[in-house]
Design a protein with these regions (language model features):
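Surface-exposed patches in mature extracellular/periplasmic domains of secreted proteins
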Residues: 150-154
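OB/S1-fold single-stranded nucleic-acid-binding modules
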Residues: 7-9
Length: 162
């Protein structure tokens, strides 16, 4: 079995291994998955958080070891981005990555999330998994989705599925 984690802002998950195939979900930054099937240009993944299966373009898949996957899976130090959009910095590549609200920040401490050798700096607003979130903040976040356009499989205020 192979494993992966999204290192891109958002990756389209498709019904079939084909560019014109409908998008059925989106994988946000920091979400991890198991690779359950491979083709020349495509990999089929099973998302950890909801067990949803979809195809992603191989060039958008980032493989990690089983140990790294398990470390993410069992991490007690999670955070989630709650800014509409924010900037993350890939420390190893010195490059910026836009992060959408709901992006996962595994092993998050002191403004950085990490998996394996990969370290990302994040200065946006977060909610840490162990701290919970207030009712008021849930309502504030929900309001960011008001007037969001409908997008089949979408998972952000820039396009959301029902």
């Amino acid at each position: 079995m192979k494993y992966g984690v999204s290192q891109l802002s958002v990756v389209p998950g498709r019904e079939e291994p084909s560019d014109p195939s409908e998008m059925v979900t989106q994988i946000l930054f920091g979400e991890h998955y198991k690779i359950i099937e491979e083709r020349a240009k495509w990999v089929k993944v099973r998302l950890s958080y909801d067990k949803y299966e979809c195809w992603i373009d191989r060039i958008q898949a980032f493989e990690v070891t089983k140990d790294v996957y398990n470390a993410i899976e069992t991490s007690k130090s999670w955070a989630t981005s709650i800014d509409l959009a924010a900037i993350g910095i890939d420390i190893n590549k010195d490059s910026m990555i836009p992060l959408l609200m709901g992006s996962s920040l595994p092993n998050y401490e002191n403004g950085k999330c990490r998996w394996g050798e990969n370290v990302f700096e994040f200065s946006g607003m977060t909610v840490k998994s162990e701290s919970g979130i207030s009712r008021e903040k849930i309502v504030d976040n929900a309001m960011m989705y008001v007037n969001a356009p409908y997008l089949w499989g979408g998972r952000s205020p820039f396009g959301i599925d029902c």
